[in-house]
Amino acid sequence: KESMFFSFANTVEILNYYKTNKGHGWIGLRFQLNPETPPNDCVLHVVMHDNDSLMQQKALGRIGVNLIYGLYHYSHDPELFINSLLDGLGHGRIEIDMLRLIGPDFEHIDNRLLSMQLVKNGLTNAAMFGPDGNVLQASQALYKKNILILRGRFRPITHVNLDMLKMGLKEFRKEEDIEVDRIQVLFELTLKDLSAEGKIEEKDFLDRVD
C-alpha cells in the first residue's frame, strides 16, 4: 500500500548510417503520484539534433531519466518540470515540440499553457494545438497540408482579422498545386505579441486562444 508504479515506453527513429533522416520519437510515461490511485499519462515528442546515432541514444536516455525524476519531484511546478527535462544535455541537442500531461492529479493543468512554456523556455520554436484545446505535434498535423497562416495579436480577434483571412484564403485557393481539401488555416501568436512589459500573462494567453 506504500508503492507507486510507473510504466515507461518510447518509439524512436534515430539517425541512420547515411544520415538521410532526422532522429525523432515519442516518449510516454504512465505513473502514480500516490499509492493505490488511478494513473496519470505524460506523452512528449522529441526531435534529436545530434549528428551521431550513439549521441542521440544517450540523449534520449538522459531525457527519459529526467522525465521520470521531474514528474515525481517537480509536478507541483509545471515550468520547473519542463526546464528539468533537459538537465545534463547541452543546448540544442534535443527539441521537445509537444507535451501532453493528463490524469487525476493534473486536472487543473491546461496543456496549452505547457505548450507555451515549451516555447518560452527555448525547448522548441513553436507549439500547436487544435480548436478543441488538445495539443498537436506540428509535423504530424501539417503533413502534406497547404498552410495558410494569419499572424496577429488577437486581443480580441477583429473583423479586420477575419476579412484578411477571408481574402487571403480566396487568393490562396487560386494558387497552382493547391489542393483545396488539404488547406489548413492557422492562427499564429508570437511570444512578443503575448508579452506585456516583458511578462506573459497566462490568463491573457488563454483568453486569446479561446
Q: Where are these predicted regions, by residue range?
A:
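Nucleotidyltransferase catalytic core that binds NTPs
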Residues: 1-210
